[in-house]
Amino acid sequence: MLLFCIPDFNEALKLMSSALDHCSFVAIDGEFTGLHSGSSPGVFDTPAERYQHLKENCCDFLLIQLGVCIFKYEKQKKGYGYVAYPFNFYVFPRPSMRAAPDQRFLCQSSSIDFLVSHGFDFNKLFYKGIGYLTAVDNMRVKEMVQQRHAQYEGNASLLSDCSPNFNSPSTAKRPVDVPEEHKPFIDDVCKRVGEFTAGTDEELKLEPCTGYQRKLVYQTIKSRHPSGLHLDTHTTEDKKERFIVVRRVTEEEKKKLAQDKLQAELDDVDEASGICRVMKMIAESGKVVVGHNMMLDVIHMMHQFTGPLPDTLVEFKSMVGCVFSRLLDTKVMANTQPFKELFPITGLTDLMCKCDEEPFRRPHIVIPPTNFTDYTVNQKFHEAAYDAYITGVCFATMANYLGSFLTPPKPRVSPTSNLIEPFLNK
């Protein structure tokens, strides 16, 4: 269960939650539909200019695969080592509910070709990719759900935390204006509901109809039968059409059904947050988050899973700090003393190769055989979880090297050590 998609996403969250408990650090990586819609950033750009360029030229592309590798330190019988838990998520902004944003995005042909050449499964991305709702969209959709329920039920108490400017007049107090072309349909529904109320059946299933017709049915029946009935929308077995079920209820039952339905829809909104739940779990763990040349990864993660990017680098750093309090870039680390002379080339593959040579000693790392592909024997460069895995391996190796400067030398340096502080949040 290495590649996590819709069917097993909740199982992945359980595994991730367990792995995050008492872990040492987390490594991340992303794959994108493109890199730059214009020119690449200049080599002499200031950090502020680089941020502005990336913000303006990259955010129309999507992060479509998120790799997360969680490293948990365990003292082995023969030395010191880590257990690594790699998670690979396909990410696609599917409109999982009616009020969710219907996103547009760019693709860069060279980037798509590159991903295909490395085995990226676009069928899995589009068919089973995990969606997401940012915190801003989550609140907006919840407000829309609450307003709609309050309008249908004529009950302002259902608006627990909606906008104070929202006015919820009871639909029962307003005449329903039914367009001429829909009057025969509504008249037939009213006749059937009238016969139902005069009978003894517990429920009445109406014929499938359009969303607008359902709205008219709700408003009309609510107006003519303000009490004693509860209306709910269901989906046909083939999931192609929707219809209304009318039930007899007491006022107490009606109120509880309305509250239960509202809560279920609010829970669905939280469920639709999708990959944002992964971000939240990592953020709440407070662990060091490691990436390689990670500026672009962080920009996309903030933009897609948190909210709109601010205008300035200072504001962006503040935004990132609210989510990831401790970030470490292995490329920056490799370009900083005492590593600078040891890494003439700082690409991720080159970094990995150098970490296998003196004076470095890679720590012993194992991957659980159940639920995870063993990256220790299977190289899959440019699969996000694999790149996150080797990024974490490089970081652990470089961190341990710092221990050789201590007196006496230490074979392992923790991510929380003071020796790591100079490389954080750069």
Annotate each PLM feature:
Residues 4-63, 67-69:
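Entry/capping segment at the start of metal-dependent catalytic domains
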